[in-house]
């Protein structure tokens, strides 16, 4: 079954420490007309991730210094983070920003940084059906709020793969399924399981951004000749005529 693990904030992991846990309760902006906008409880992306708390009145020009938009996508609310700089901010569509008028605004973010917090990750290990200690590692990350492609797609396929592998009558390898916050969670997991991973894992896969309608793509391992590369390149040619094959130089997620 699913095993869940917690690492306390402040724990030494290689050359860094697990950061304080960010807790967000609410956030919004009150306009000069008294309207409440950028409500966290209506859309998580309205608050800068890892934002410091704020409760102040300020002018539009002052507020704009803390607002993030995507001008070339005028209706989109961007996903912006502040790891690990202590600053505050809001995210909104560029259309909404352009509609704001001069006057006094009230910016409110109810958040805190828990020095006694924790980082959580989980794993499921499905054993082989023959005598074999070698493993296939399959991971996905869980840390981007209210996002479909760059978040939910990975865990959704991860869950389906767990079901699929469990139902296999014959399994040559053991399967290690890991789900954790991107980057920091994976670093913690490697730190806690390094010797086991080094001695047993023969192939690894990271499920990232697999929920859009673009071409199937794969980022190869550094040597481009691992078991995971061979299996992926063999499979991908049977499901698409136009795969995107990237070298390891294009890494950007937990495959790093």
Residue ranges and their predicted role:
Residues 1-256:
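N-terminal hydrophobic/helix-forming segments and targeting peptides
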């Amino acid at each position: 079954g699913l095993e869940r693990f917690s690492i306390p904030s402040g724990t030494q992991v290689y050359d860094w420490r697990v950061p304080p846990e960010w807790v967000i309760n609410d956030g919004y902006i009150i306009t000069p007309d008294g309207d409440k906008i950028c409500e966290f409880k209506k859309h998580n992306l309205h608050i800068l991730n890892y934002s410091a708390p704020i409760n102040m009145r300020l002018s539009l020009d002052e507020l704009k210094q803390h607002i993030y938009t995507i001008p070339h996508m005028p209706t989109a609310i961007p996903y912006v983070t502040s790891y690990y700089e202590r600053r505050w901010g809001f995210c909104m569509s560029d259309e909404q920003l352009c509609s704001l008028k001069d006057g006094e605004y009230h910016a409110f973010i109810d958040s805190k940084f828990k020095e006694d917090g924790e980082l959580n990750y989980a794993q499921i290990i499905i054993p082989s059906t023959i005598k074999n200690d070698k493993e296939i590692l399959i991971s996905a990350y869980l840390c981007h709020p209210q996002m479909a492609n760059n978040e939910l797609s990975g865990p959704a396929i991860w869950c389906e793969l767990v079901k699929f592998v469990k139902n296999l009558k014959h399994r040559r390898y053991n399967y290690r399924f890991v789900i954790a916050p991107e980057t920091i969670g994976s670093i913690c997991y490697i730190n806690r399981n390094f010797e086991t991973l080094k001695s047993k894992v023969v192939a690894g896969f990271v499920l990232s951004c697999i929920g859009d309608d673009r071409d199937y793509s794969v980022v190869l391992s550094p040597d481009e000749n691992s078991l995971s590369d061979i299996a992926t390149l063999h499979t991908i040619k049977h499901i698409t005529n136009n795969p995107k094959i990237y070298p390891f130089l294009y890494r950007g997620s937990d495959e790093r």
